[in-house]
Design a protein with these regions (language model features):
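RecB-family 4Fe-4S metal-dependent nuclease core
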Residues: 1-271
Length: 271
């Protein structure tokens, strides 16, 4: 059971998202513990997050950002460390060299445009919200500053206002801010770093109210009930997620004929 042990089991925003996209993928990852190495695009995101974390953690005490070069180096180093743990090769994705260059470009935008905009109070802060049901909620806030919660996302396409307004993950962060500070976040912000020919920053702000929190609670209760009942419904056949490019379990999934298409291989350095 995910998040189990001596404490009450918990769900995270990413677990809820996985369960609702594909219950079978959730079962294999969080119930059976069958971990699949991330794609190189995910490792890129991890690298940029490392650069942001290194800068903002020291900024809490200093009030100043690190030099741009230091933030870039921290991001690239985070990317390289991520690769040492293995990654899933995508023939349609970037090469390692190109991916590393993209990380450096994204980190440049991060350092020049995002970092100067915030004086953080909390960075990469784990928050547990105790709930009356079978599961608590546990998540990590990227950044809190001036009553806001900020989440950094690297994407290939620009996110939309509609997406941000509805994201349950961001609703959780707004609630988690109250656990940290006693106040619900006055604004939730996505700092979207977009991988285009010229990487760009898009800041998308939103708010959350009681109806958003009620909707999140309903999702948590539904997912928790499904897990307790052992119900793990697979993704719809033909959905974007149900493909070898986006699901590492595809080739061995009992709900698809994985022999028809195989485009990914697991690469582990040194093997």
């Amino acid at each position: 059971m995910p998040g189990s042990g001596d404490q009450k089991p918990y769900l995270s925003p990413s677990q809820i998202e996985t369960y609702l996209r594909c219950g079978e993928a959730y079962r294999r990852r969080y119930v059976d513990g069958e971990r699949i190495a991330p794609g190189i695009v995910a490792v890129q995101g991890t690298g940029v997050h490392v650069g942001a974390e290194v800068n903002f953690k020291q900024k809490i005490g200093t009030g100043s950002d690190l030099p741009v070069r230091d933030i870039i180096d921290a991001s690239v180093d985070g990317f390289d460390r991520g690769l040492t743990e293995g990654w899933t090769v995508d023939p349609e994705g970037p090469s390692v060299g190109d991916a590393r260059d993209e990380v450096a470009s994204l980190a440049t935008v991060l350092a020049q445009e995002v970092c100067p905009a915030y004086q953080p109070t909390h960075v990469e802060q784990t928050v547990r919200i105790e709930l009356p049901g079978a599961h608590d909620m546990l998540g990590v806030i990227d950044l809190a500053a001036d009553g806001k919660v900020i989440d950094l996302k690297t994407t290939g396409k620009t996110m939309t206002q509609g997406q941000v307004d509805k994201l349950p993950q961001i609703t959780f962060y707004a609630a988690a801010h109250k656990v940290l500070t006693g106040e619900i976040a006055n604004e939730v912000v996505i700092e979207n770093l977009v991988k285009s020919k010229k990487p760009k920053r898009v800041r998308i702000a939103s708010t959350r109210d009681k109806r958003d929190f009620s909707a999140l609670a309903a999702r948590i209760n539904a997912v928790s009930a499904g897990i307790q009942a052992g119900v793990f419904v697979p993704a719809e056949a033909g959905s974007w997620m149900c493909s070898p490019r986006w699901c590492g379990y595809y080739d061995s999934c009992p709900y698809v004929n994985g022999a028809k298409t195989t485009i990914v291989d697991l690469h582990v350095p040194g093997e």
